[in-house]
Amino acid sequence: MSVHRASHATSIPRRRHRIWPWAVLILALLVVLLGVSGFFGLKLYSEAKQVKAHEEQAMQLLGGVTDLGNLDNLDTVSQQISQAKTETSAANEIAHGTLWNIASKAPVYGDDITTVQGMTSVVDSLVSDSVPQFMNVLSTLKSAQLSSGDGQLNLQPILEAQKNIATANQSLQQQVQKYQQLPKARIGMVKNAYAAGNTQLTKMADKVNQLSGTFQILPDFLGSDQPRTYALMAMTTSEERSSGGLIGSVGVVTTDNGKISIGDFRSNGEYIPYGAGDPTEDEQRIFQQWGPLNMSFDVRDLAVYPDTSRSAEGMRAIWQRTPWGSNTQLDGVLMVDPVFLQELTKISGNVTIPDGTVLTGDNTAEFLLNKVYVDYPVSMQDALFAQVAEQAVGSMFSNIDLAKLTKVAQLMGSMAEGRHFSMYAFDETAEKTISDAGFTAQTPSSEEHPQVGVYVTEQNPSKMGWYIHRTSKVTRSTCGNDGSQTYHVEYKMTNTLENSQIGALTSYILGSGGQGVEKTLIYAPAGGSISNLKTSGGSVTESRQETLNGKTVYASNATIAPGESVTYSFDVTTSTKAVSDLTIDQTPMGWIDSGVTTDTAACSINKQ
């Protein structure tokens, strides 16, 4: 939710481009031509070939915008956008000619013509308006002095860019939404062209949205108006808690006018004497009294809450009781897991631990979530995590330029979407900006953008989370006249531990027999509902309908032996206000891939 390469056509280096398959539209339109006789049919066919040629050339010119990969040559990119505009304008003019407008009224297959018209219109609007706005922001930032030296980010250019990038992002998101609400094509080849275009547009929109969101929160987070102090809560998803995993240690992050500093990390053992994080009655009933593992609600278990706001409130309550925190105002919390740290090392550089092992952008997560428990004594584990966190987070904004800033911004956005990174500020104004930008993980709350929430907490004290793989499939069933949609969801958890591995692993990793015992909470979308909830495989307790801090949740415990799987299946109805596809918000795993696949072929939102 992207930047494109541009130069005069003769200077574009030969390389492979991802091109929307406009060529397939020609054959698809032949079906429509069967209903248009003689000369007019041939004319429509000829014009369709012209549309194909224009759009192929435009997409080739815009090939770099989708990956923000050519920030060193923004002038070249801008030239390509200008050339692409000529192509998309021509395609759009042809596709909205009199003959096309008549053909769009044809029975059955007229919608396919309308879809092609809509595709050309959206792409032309993007190239004419949204993309140039975005490129202007990048050009301004590229010419600015972003680094103030000594690891400090100059925040003034970011502050000045906030409004413009938000405007460009809003325009782009509106065009993508318009594209996604085009009539559902009936001809297979048109469907394929539409799907390929949707993939390209969504990729672009995701990246711009991530960048825009990060720009909105960075200045305040980095202390543009006053110094800030945050608790950096290090989670291990090998021992799952709803929001991530058991908190192994807590560091102190201070920010001041663009400079970020990492203070001492303290193990959870140093925090335990200072009590629990003030759980609500609902939280005590579900997470402590029910069991089988009774949560203590001390610092180790603060991620058991699926809402970051509750984890933050619990952290502040404990912080204020400690000798090191009682006289220091805590402005907020940052919750990070090893996947976030791994992705940061790709940007900030490798980390070498004391024994010479080099942690990179490929092996850091596996090391911190599994190998450290296999190969290192318990006494060293927290210190190794702290070293990686201190180096990776501490250098996020050092030696910054536009390319690095863009990478960090996109990373923060994508990691927040997957719950590998979350933050919360106690200042209400600051938190509203953070939450609106998508950086505060929370249970489903938007009727317009529906989500199902699935959150798991390990009930077998162990590090089995590394071996529990979760996959899901979301299939749209119907699109109602009232604006709601129905979906069928299959959510599967598999214990990938093999019996042959058990003998080589300690009880510290395996707990009781290498079982996964997953307390599973399932939330319906805001304003929607869940029905026909069933389970198969493993051993699952009957789902209890509970209330957790004002929201209905379906709760159960699933026991999964090595090699076994448990599947939850249920139907979902969204709010009538829904404008986007149903997604799944879930407890993060030890890798980037969420395991979610979506099939929306049945119908289009707001269309039959």
What label would you give each PLM region?
Residues S2-S7, R14-L30, V36-G595, C603-K607:
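Non-catalytic, solvent-exposed segments at the cell envelope interface
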Residues D599:
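Acidic, glycine-rich low-complexity segments
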